[in-house]
């Protein structure tokens, strides 16, 4: 509350946000923390964004946060990555994500803005990595390549890592534009 009142911060993002709704019986969107924030005249007016997962049981809660909250939409991330990679997801899956993921957020008065669409984040591949590597390469950081996510849904388009092959570079740049155009024009936040 101090940050909103005195520092004029107008929004907060909560990493591993599902923990905020943990009650003795599991995740509850009407739990104590959410209820307190919803009743506070100042905090209920700021932007609240939760990463809707944590490592606990029942930790995956995409679409489960209360009205007034937005959530990272990993369904958007995975579907769009697969779509531009020409894998598993159908045009219908892509259309659902592009039009705001109503199947996830269109309940309890929530609208497409409840989903925060993203392609990459702080704890995974960058957009450049997404079109340059089939797998992660974190060998040099002392973790024996065990850190980071293994399901990146990426493609190197013909060469792992940096390349001077003009054809591959052109495809990678086009794919970056495809990803960004999809993100910018999709419904959601």
Protein language model features and the residues they cover:
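Conserved alpha/beta catalytic core and glycan-binding cleft of carbohydrate-active enzymes
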Residues: 8, 23, 29-189
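Active-site groove signature of glycoside hydrolases
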Residues: 2-23
């Amino acid at each position: 509350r101090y940050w909103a009142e005195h520092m004029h911060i107008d929004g907060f993002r909560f990493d591993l946000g599902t923990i905020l709704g943990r009650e003795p019986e599991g995740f509850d969107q009407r739990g104590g923390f959410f209820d307190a924030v919803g009743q506070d005249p100042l905090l209920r007016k700021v932007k609240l964004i939760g990463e809707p997962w944590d490592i606990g049981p029942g930790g995956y809660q995409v679409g489960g946060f209360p009205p007034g909250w937005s959530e990272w939409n990993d369904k958007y991330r995975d579907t769009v990555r697969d779509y531009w990679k020409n894998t598993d997801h159908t045009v219908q899956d892509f259309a659902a994500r592009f039009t705001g993921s109503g199947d996830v957020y269109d309940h309890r008065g929530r609208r497409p803005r409840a989903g925060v669409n993203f392609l990459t984040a702080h704890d995974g591949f960058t957009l450049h990595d997404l079109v340059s590597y089939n797998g992660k390469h974190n060998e040099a950081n002392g973790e024996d390549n065990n850190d980071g996510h293994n399901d990146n849904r990426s493609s190197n388009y013909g060469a792992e890592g940096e390349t001077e092959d003009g054809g591959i570079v052109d495809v990678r740049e086009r794919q970056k534009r495809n990803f960004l155009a999809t993100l910018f024009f999709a419904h959601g936040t």
